[in-house]
């Protein structure tokens, strides 16, 4: 059975004026986050801004986190990506979800109220445990770094 996360809605316009976040298909990993704005915001080339989503989250389960990712169409067609490239939401964060938006394009871009601006994906978390060792067990690859395994 698929695990569910409780997402609180802070802004009463979400679900009324702006649609609730949804998964586009049964196989969608990400759900769309919308700009919960009172009016349009123009973003000049090279500029960044924080945009509220109207949602708050407390994942609570330390085995889960969420990541905010750019929407591929906005990045490819308009140069609109996340200001921090990927937003990480830890399980113990409790608060409103804000999206840092960066216009890396050459033209101004207008963010409209209710526009889909990013997507959020929930992911499992594995925490590393560090152990000081003298050497690793030998592998076929060894210390081969960038490009070591070839292109074909």
From Swiss-Prot:
Pfam families: dUTPase. It catalyses: dUTP + H2O = dUMP + diphosphate + H(+). Pathway: Pyrimidine metabolism; dUMP biosynthesis; dUMP from dCTP (dUTP route): step 2/2. It is an enzyme of class 3 (hydrolase). Its cofactor is Mg(2+). Its EC number is 3.6.1.23. The keyword Transmembrane helix does not apply. GO terms for biological process: dUMP biosynthetic process; dUTP catabolic process. GO terms for molecular function: dUTP diphosphatase activity; magnesium ion binding. Signal peptide: none annotated. Belongs to the dUTPase family. NCBIfam families: dut, PRK00601.1. This enzyme is involved in nucleotide metabolism: it produces dUMP, the immediate precursor of thymidine nucleotides and it decreases the intracellular concentration of dUTP so that uracil cannot be incorporated into DNA. This is Deoxyuridine 5'-triphosphate nucleotidohydrolase. It comes from Salmonella arizonae (strain ATCC BAA-731 / CDC346-86 / RSK2980).
